Amino acid sequence: MNVEVLDISIDYGIDTSVGYFGVDLRAAHMESYEYQARPTDSFVEQAGSYTVPELRGNVSVWWNYDKYSAGATINYVDSFDQMYGVIPEVDSHPTLDLQATYDLTDNSRITVGALNVTDEDPPWSDSEAEGYSYGTAGHSPWGTVLYARATVRF
């Protein structure tokens, strides 16, 4: 296997009288993904095809003030070509996550949030060997997921 990936990470924040605001960008661009099934086989380029979207990443905006923080993240998985399906391309798939945190003490906090707030279905794929109707690499069938977390540091 030969892989070339460009990883990007950019963070920016600003302190204001109403709290600290931040923006984060994380992305990976698959420049090349050559796969060789057996040592005697030729390498096959798979970047942009099944299980290897060329681009995936997320952008987050967040705010902190005193004991409160909140954030939103847009996740993105690029479209990709199917190898064996009737439909030649699986659509791109953005989702939105939200969370809020309250610091109870210096050592404890509670967080609530939701993944895939808009309840986006994964894009349809008809080439899944496992029998699923979505691309399992980078996509989830769960829809909106609510969560709560308590953290205590000792």
Positions of the model-derived regions?
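Outer-membrane beta-barrel transmembrane strands
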Residues: 1-15, 50, 55-64, 71-75, ...
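Surface-exposed loop/turn and secondary-structure junction residues enriched for glycine/proline
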Residues: 1-9, 24, 33, 93, ...
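Residue-level detector of the transmembrane beta-barrel scaffold of outer-membrane proteins
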Residues: 9, 20-24, 60, 69-71, ...
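C-terminal beta-barrel architecture of Gram-negative outer-membrane proteins
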Residues: 23-103, 118
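C-terminal beta-signal and adjacent terminal beta-strands/loops
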Residues: 31-34, 76-81, 101-154
